Amino acid sequence: MAATAQTHFQSDERHTSLLSATTLVGPATVFVAAGLLAPLAILFRYSFNRFEPRRMMVETFSLDNYVKFFADPYYTGVLWTTLRVAALCTVVCLAMGLPLAYVLARTQSRFKNVLIMLVVLPLFVGNAVRAAGWMTLFGSKGFLNVTLMQLGIITQPLQIMFTEGAVIAGIIAVNLPYMVLTLQSVIEGINRNVEEAAFSLGAGPATMFRRVLLPLSLPGILGGTILTFILGMNAYATPVLLGGPKFKMMGPLVYGQFQLNNWPFGASVAFILMTATLTLTATANILIQRRFRR
């Protein structure tokens, strides 16, 4: 009798817990569906329509926009440039962010919070403002060129602005805090005794990093690389301001098509960008996890 009553009580408790969870998750689910999935579905449908200057968009179902993109070397070149820049920025952010995150996670200094604030501080400034700051540094009369000329290192200003290098530097500056914060939170959760045990067994710093810290930091590495790669692939303000009109990435290309009222082609470019980003991040995730499971 008591067992039956306890079973009913546990069943009611689970039902109440499930109902509460549904109540909490429900509004967010509706918001995401209405604010993200529905517009994406509409945009996906637009990508199969046809563009006409006078009518803007003609309802049809054709793959012409996708064929146009992959048949034109210019557009495939823009996609390749975007992939290259995003991948390079992600690798540099990981190489710079991992040591910095390790120091922040392990330091006992009373200035730790100050150091974290210095990492977070750039996030309080918009991408356009940060890009404008880089323009004052990289310009022909910017701080870098003026300093080098005054020191006699160069006689003519270096052409840094409106180059791929300027865009890469700007995107790295934008994405680096995300990488550092993601890695720091994971490294702080790794027990220090694990590292000390590796050292006591004769492992050097390089071996400890490769055999102990790196595998345990894998969730943070995956999260940070995926986040920075997605941000790099979809960058807009930085390529526009630091790359100029001749340097094209997918984000500005999508926006440019919508400015020209070519919604069908703009929608197809947007979905090509999204598909490439999701495919590459998922593939990298699978390959990295398989590598560290061995």
Predicted regions and their residues:
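Membrane-water interface segments at the C-terminal ends of transmembrane alpha-helices
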Residues: 17-52, 67-188, 212-236, 243, ...
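The alpha-helix within a helix-turn-helix
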Residues: 198
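Short cytosolic juxtamembrane segments of multi-pass membrane proteins
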Residues: 194, 287-294
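Short, membrane-interfacial amphipathic segments enriched in basic
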Residues: 12-16, 56-59, 63, 69
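Glycine-rich helix-loop "coupling/hinge" segments at transmembrane-helix boundaries
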Residues: 55-59, 236-261
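Glycine/proline-centered hinge or cleavage motifs at structural transition points of membrane proteins
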Residues: 201-202, 215
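Polytopic alpha-helical membrane proteins, predominantly small-molecule transporters/carriers
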Residues: 59, 202-205
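Short, Lys/Arg-rich, polar N-terminal cytosolic tail immediately upstream
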Residues: 1-18
